[in-house]
């Protein structure tokens, strides 16, 4: 069973456990038929190839806690590559400047407006850092100044598989600079 992007998102935000009761067959895995592919997006500006552990941690967790047929390999596609438009899940990360070229911008907008899910990871962990500010500026220029909104702790993403009362709590600052900045919320652009 290959999932469309919309089906994957519905499962992610609306009850992954119950929807994936039927386990994968060995032949399906052997043939390379997967329900989930992890796609990392590379972009021309900044440093897209950071935090090598995150993809493997997510992939391992999906294999361990779900019965989805999960491709164990991370796939890397350029944001300018039209094949990224077919991926049900994309990951974009970095520490530095995010400034999409015209093709990257068009693909990002088309992907999101058509229901794509992009997990964006600020590897600086700095609320006021270059990655956060430049990514938010890109989103404002593409989707409008008020497009990025804080997710309430009651959002379905916090109760889709495990139940959380909000984003992961930390007992220490995340950026290591002594300014006590911690992420108390997640942000999203929700295209209806």
Indicate residue ranges for each PLM-predicted region:
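Aromatic-Pro/Gly-enriched surface loop or interdomain linker
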Residues: 23-89, 93-96
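N-terminal secretory signal peptides and thylakoid transit peptides that target proteins
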Residues: 1-16
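Structured segments of extracytoplasmic/periplasmic soluble domains
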Residues: 61-69, 93, 110-114, 138-145
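Extracytoplasmic/secreted proteins, especially bacterial periplasmic and envelope-associated proteins
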Residues: 53-57, 61, 103, 107, ...
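Short alpha-beta junction capping motif
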Residues: 38, 89-132
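Glycine-rich, histidine-containing beta strand-loop boundary motifs that form or position
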Residues: 12, 121-122, 152
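Hydrophobic h-region of N-terminal signal peptides that target proteins for export
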Residues: 18-22
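An acidic, glycine-rich "communication" segment
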Residues: 125-192
